[in-house]
Regions:
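Short active-site oxyanion
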Residues: 85-89, 140-141, 248-251, 308-311
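PRPP-associated nucleotide enzymes
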Residues: 30-233, 258, 265, 269
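Substrate-recognition element of Asp-dependent hydrolases with the DxDx(T/V) motif
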Residues: 241-264, 278-280
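Acidic, Mg2+-coordinating phosphoryl-transfer loop and its flanking beta/alpha structural elements
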Residues: 164-173, 309-341
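Donor nucleotide-activated moiety binding/catalytic core segment of transferases
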Residues: 273-308
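Cysteine-centered metal-binding/redox modules
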Residues: 1-50
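Conserved Lys-Pro-Asp/Glu-containing loop-to-beta segment of HAD-superfamily phosphomonoesterases
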Residues: 139-145, 294-317
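Acidic, divalent-metal-coordinating active-site segment for phosphoryl/phosphodiester hydrolysis
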Residues: 148-158, 299, 304, 316-327
Length: 341
């Protein structure tokens, strides 16, 4: 490979470094005057990309709420009812209340929640909804959580409620000894749709913007700058997909840099918790518009490498494939398609 000169006549996609070289140093301008040794070293650094990961994720389907409910009703509950009489369902806050509510409704049983006394560190059961009939308190309570990972929570529940049933819809093999029942063994790694966006993974995650935090911009709006800026300022958000509790590494978007103020104001208005906003260079607009999927996909992949991000949440499958091709180390999450790879 020839490192004796810069091979790019202008800012754009560089096939030597396999990244977008803009006019901002140390990219395209830097390369004009760099020594062969500097270019070769930069190539090695660029190719190295992300070499460290928290945990290698396989490809798979994102586990959806509908999967959680189906497993609770059709796999877990029949196992329990074959051997026990149940007089109530106790949902373990917070996400354990999701399957618990559906199971209680399906069986027409009272729904309870679990509360903890902070002063005494003891647990008690609180009634949330009665059944339509007159259920006698005969049999056992079914304590239900969505997932069990280490088994510590279920172990504590067994100590507090030794005469009742402790269960989880999904459980790791490690947690099984502390459960009476589980619907399905689910060893990691995996992604759960109902908690991913505020899970510990988010600190190592970068996000696409349009199509993830809000609907994609309609084509007719893109062609009219007044409509476009109004859209950026006022588009409704997908609140359930926004990192709020844990700060995301970055938001990386194909929007042009000149719309930064509008974009930052919208992100602030919607309480998105992120560290950096990376936007597409204004001077590469024509190149972007000729082949948006490839150019923006590569630009995102390049910045994901620089951020050392483990996950990238992308709205478009076609762009996601480009990102994965350019950066094999990142796990690309596609919530609109229900998959990650």
């Amino acid at each position: 490979m020839d490192f004796s000169k810069c091979h790019c006549p202008k800012p754009g996609m560089c096939n030597i470094f396999n990244k977008v070289m803009t006019e901002v140093p140390p990219n395209w301008q830097w390369c004009q005057n760099a020594t062969p040794e500097e270019r070769e070293k930069y190539k090695q650094t660029s190719d190295a990309g992300v070499q460290t990961r928290l945990k290698k994720f396989p490809s798979g389907d994102i586990i959806q709420v509908v999967d959680l409910i189906d497993c609770a009703i059709n796999k877990l509950t029949p196992k329990v009812l074959r051997k026990h009489k149940i007089f109530g369902i106790v949902g373990i806050p917070r996400s354990g209340l999701i399957p618990a509510a559906y199971v209680a409704e399906a069986l027409d049983l009272p729904l309870y929640s679990l509360a903890q006394h902070k002063s005494s560190n003891t647990n008690k059961v609180i009634l949330l909804k009665r059944s339509s009939g007159n259920n006698a308190s005969v049999g056992k309570l079914l304590f239900l959580d969505d997932t069990s990972s280490s088994g510590r929570s279920s172990e504590n529940l067994k100590k507090s409620f030794p005469n009742h049933i402790i269960s989880s819809v999904f459980s790791t093999s490690k947690a099984l000894p502390n459960l009476d029942y589980c619907g399905k063994i689910l060893d990691g790694p995996h992604i759960l749709s109902w908690n991913f966006f505020n899970s510990h993974h988010i600190k190592n995650t970068a996000f696409d913007l349009d199509g993830v935090f809000c609907p994609n911009v309609p084509l007719d709006v893109c062609k009219d700058d007044n409509k476009y800026t109004n859209y950026l300022a006022n588009v409704e958000s997908y609140h359930y997909r926004m990192p709020k509790v844990v700060k995301a590494k970055a938001v990386i978007t194909g929007r042009l840099e000149k719309y930064r103020n509008l974009t930052e104001a919208w992100l602030k208005k919607n309480d998105v918790n992120y560290d950096k906003l990376i936007m597409f260079p204004n001077e590469l607009r024509a190149e972007r518009d000729k082949n948006h999927q490839q150019i923006v996909g590569r630009y995102k992949a390049e910045n994901i490498k620089l951020l050392n991000a483990n996950f990238f949440v992308e709205s478009e499958m076609s762009e996601a494939k480009v990102i994965k091709r350019e950066n094999e180390f990142v796990t690309v999450v596609c919530p609109n398609n229900g998959v990650y790879f």
